[in-house]
Structures are given as structure tokens and as C-alpha cells.
């Protein structure tokens, strides 16, 4: 089994690709995703392959990194399944994981996050949870997204340590984590 994330950057034309693309690359590199496992295509679309256990973590990390930039957001779909054909280009690979990711992406409409797996009951439950999480994530302010991402990447850090590393007050970190 593999996980495939298909995503589009929302409002990508409002921000220089140098800004969001470098943040995206750093996020994927810090998460241990090899460059050969992801691709930016059509200018602002992203597709990546990951282990299923890491797919949701990566999705939330990508959401947090894009929300750090004013007016930027991301729509993404996670597909879980087999990969039956691997190409040098991620976007040319194929299999149920890609089909599930593409189907979930096509069904997003106004949603920004969804998952499709071989298990319908699992999908129904998890997509309800993702809809609820998206109500908060879609409204993150840049500072909240930055603090959330720092906590996500460093779960053992105390709020005081996060505050020091981001040059913020501990009370602001506490407030942002509660809101996010």
C-alpha cells in the first residue's frame, strides 16, 4: 500500500513561486520525502507518494506551510492503494492509489481536504473528521499556521521553547495552539 497526495495551491498567482515553492520543498525535505517522490506540475499542482501512515501528517503539514503565507491555501486529496506502475515522473505513475487520490480530488468541490481508500466505511468516518478539522485549518492566520507547524514538527517542545524559537511570547503561542 502507498499514499498519494494530489494538491493544488489556491491563489498561487498572488504570491511568487519562489516563496511558496521553497517552503514546500523544505517541508517535504524535513518530513523525509525524497525529491524523486514528489513533483510540481502545471505550475501550482503537486503530487507526491508517501507511506500511508505519513499521508495525513504530510497533508496537514502542507496545509500549515501554505497558510503561513497570506492569501495562500491548498486543496488536496489523499489516495491510499497500490501503485502498479512507477515512472520517473510521479505524475506519470499509476495504480489504485493514484486513482483514489484523483477521484477524491475531483470530488472536493469547495472542500480543501479529503481521503479515499479501498475501505468505504473508513473513508466516510475519516472524511467527516477531516471536514471538521478543515473548518479550523481553512481559517488559520499565518502566525497560527506557523506555530501549529512548529508544534507538529516538534511535538516534544514546550510552548516556551516554541515561543523562543519563533521570537514570540509564550502567551501568543498558547493562544494560537488553542485556536488551531
Which role does the model predict for each range below?
Residues 1-180:
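Regulatory and interdomain segments flanking nucleotide-handling catalytic cores
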Amino acid at each position: 500500500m502507498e499514499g498519494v497526495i494530489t494538491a493544488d495551491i489556491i491563489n498561487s498567482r498572488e504570491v511568487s513561486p519562489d516563496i511558496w515553492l521553497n517552503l514546500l520543498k523544505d517541508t517535504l525535505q524535513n518530513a523525509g520525502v525524497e525529491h524523486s517522490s514528489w513533483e510540481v506540475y502545471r505550475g501550482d499542482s503537486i503530487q507526491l507518494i508517501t507511506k500511508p501512515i505519513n499521508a495525513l501528517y504530510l497533508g496537514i503539514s502542507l496545509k500549515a506551510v501554505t497558510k503561513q503565507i497570506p492569501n495562500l491555501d491548498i486543496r488536496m486529496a489523499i489516495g491510499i492503494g497500490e501503485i502498479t506502475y512507477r515512472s520517473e515522473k510521479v505524475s506519470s505513475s499509476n495504480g489504485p492509489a493514484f486513482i483514489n487520490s484523483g477521484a477524491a480530488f475531483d470530488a472536493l468541490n469547495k472542500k480543501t481536504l479529503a481521503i479515499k481508500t479501498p475501505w468505504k466505511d473508513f473513508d466516510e468516518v475519516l472524511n467527516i473528521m477531516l471536514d471538521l478539522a478543515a473548518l479550523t485549518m481553512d481559517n488559520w492566520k499565518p502566525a497560527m499556521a506557523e506555530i501549529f507547524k512548529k508544534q507538529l514538527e516538534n511535538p516534544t517542545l514546550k510552548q516556551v521553547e516554541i515561543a523562543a524559537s519563533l521570537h514570540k511570547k509564550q502567551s501568543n503561542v498558547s493562544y494560537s495552539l488553542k485556536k488551531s
